[in-house]
Amino acid sequence: MARSIDPAPRAVRGFVPARTDEERFLMRHVEDLARAAEGRGIARYSGFLSDREQDLARAALNRADVPESDHHFEGGWPGAARKLLCLEPEGCYPASPLCCVKLTCRTLSGAALPGHKDYLGSLMGLELRREALGDIVLLADTPGTAYVFALETAGELICRELLQVGRTEVTTTLLSLDEVPEFPQAERKTQTATVSSLRLDAVLAAMLHCSRGQACEWIAAGRVEINHLPAESAHAPVYEGDVFTVRGKGRFGLTALPGKSKKDRSIIEFFQY
C-alpha cells in the first residue's frame, strides 16, 4: 500500500475520569488501600482489575501521591490482561494472594472441548465475584487444559467445588506461580486498511468489513465499547492504542496510525484478539 512520506502527528487518548458510582468507589478504595499500606508499612492488594479499572487505580494512586516504586500490577503471567494492584511499601513483607488453578478435562477422544466462555460460566456458577478471577488461559498446544488465575481463597474453592465445565468433567490442581509453565505469546496478525476519516464508524467498518451504516447501528444499539467504556457516538475520534469491543463480533486493537496514503486516506494498522 502506498504511503505518504510524512506520518501524521501521533495523538493519544487522554484519561477518562470516573463516570459511575462504582468507578468512584473503586478509586476511593484504592486510596484507602494506599493509605493503609503507607501508614502501617504492610502490603495491601486489590482484587483483579480490568484495563479500565487499572487506569482508574493509577489515577487514584497519582492523586494519593503514591511513589511508583511502592506499587505494581501483577496478573500471574507476562501477557495478563486482568491484574491485581500490589501495594508493597519499602521494607514490607510481600504476601501476594495470587495463585493459579490448572483445569484438565476428562473427556473421550474427539469430544468437543470447553471454550473460554464455558470455563468462565462454570466458575461464575460457583458464586465467585468477578474480581476474584483473573485471566483464563487456554493453550493451543495442550487442548483440554486451562489455567485460571485467581485469588488464593477463590483458587481453593475452585479446587473443592468445580467438578465439571459444561458437560465435561475436570480435575483441578492448585499451583503456585513458580509452578505455572511459560506460556507462548499469542501471534496476532496485523492488518492494514485505509479509512476516509479517523472516526469510530469508519474505523469499525474497516475492521469488520461492513458498511459504515451497519457500524453506526451497532454503536447506537450499545454493542460497541472503546477501552471498556460504552461508545457514545459514531463520530467519536479514535486514537492509537485504542481497544474496540463489538458484542458478538470480537475485540480489536488499533496498533498504529502510520499516516496518509497517496489518495489522502488515513492508514490504520490493527489486529483481532
Give the role of each language-model region.
Residues M1-D201, M207, P230, F244, ...:
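Ferredoxin-like alpha/beta domains used as RNA- or RNAP-binding modules
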Residues S197-G248:
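Basic (Lys/Arg-enriched) interaction patch that binds polyanionic ligands
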